[in-house]
Amino acid sequence: MNTVIYPGTFDPITNGHKDLIARASRIFDKVVVAVAASPKKNPLFSLEERVDLVRQVVKPFPNVDVKGFSNLLADFVQQNQANIILRGLRAVSDFEYEFQLADMNRKLAPNVESLFLTPANHLSYISSTLIREIAALGGDVTEFVDPIVSKALQQQFALRK
């Protein structure tokens, strides 16, 4: 079985993430969306909330599983009997950082490969950071995220007022 791990913070999951997951689900037998705890990033949503949102968004894809993790990605990949990490590249600026991560993961787990996909053109400018900023200021994010995520963002920011 050909299993790929797609890691990220997914705070929140965007239509760009969903596009990559949909494409990966057609390429690989199994896709594991690995939601990172990322406490240093001070996420808006808890790990449990992010895992739940991702699960709801990827429900249409039967070969996609969603798991939270807080250990090294290289270890998580091996624990899930995978040897491929999928990453999205939106712009050249993403490449340098992703290249460093790929090199480090290769050092930590020599049998693990990193595979990069570029997003669809109409999704290339979307980032979770921008989505959070727009939502925090009361902007409409429905074009960029699943309706479930849009509602969760509205609720989250309503609680903070």
UniProtKB/Swiss-Prot annotation:
Primary subcellular site in the record, as a coarse category: cytoplasm
Localization, UniProt: Cytoplasm
Record-level GO cellular component terms: cytoplasm
Keywords: ATP-binding, Coenzyme A biosynthesis, Cytoplasm, Magnesium, Nucleotide-binding, Nucleotidyltransferase, Transferase
Keyword ATP-binding: yes
One Pfam entry name: CTP_transf_like
Protein name: Phosphopantetheine adenylyltransferase
Subunit structure of this chain's protein: Homohexamer.
InterPro entries in UniProt: Cyt_trans-like, PPAT, Rossmann-like_a/b/a_fold
Residues flagged as site, Transition state stabilizer: H17
Enzyme class label: transferase
Residues noted as binding ATP in the record, renumbered to the chain: T9, F10, H17, G88, L89, R90, E98, L123, S124, Y125, I126, S127, S128, T129
GO biological process: coenzyme A biosynthetic process
Binding-site positions, substrate: T9, K41, L73, R87
Metabolic or biological pathway: Cofactor biosynthesis; coenzyme A biosynthesis; CoA from (R)-pantothenate: step 4/5
Co-factor(s): Mg(2+)
Assigned EC number: 2.7.7.3
Known function: Reversibly transfers an adenylyl group from ATP to 4'-phosphopantetheine, yielding dephospho-CoA (dPCoA) and pyrophosphate.
GO molecular function: ATP binding; pantetheine-phosphate adenylyltransferase activity
Catalyzed reactions per annotation: (R)-4'-phosphopantetheine + ATP + H(+) = 3'-dephospho-CoA + diphosphate
Keyword Cytoplasm: yes
Species per Swiss-Prot/TrEMBL record: Hahella chejuensis (strain KCTC 2396)
UniProt similarity note: Belongs to the bacterial CoaD family.
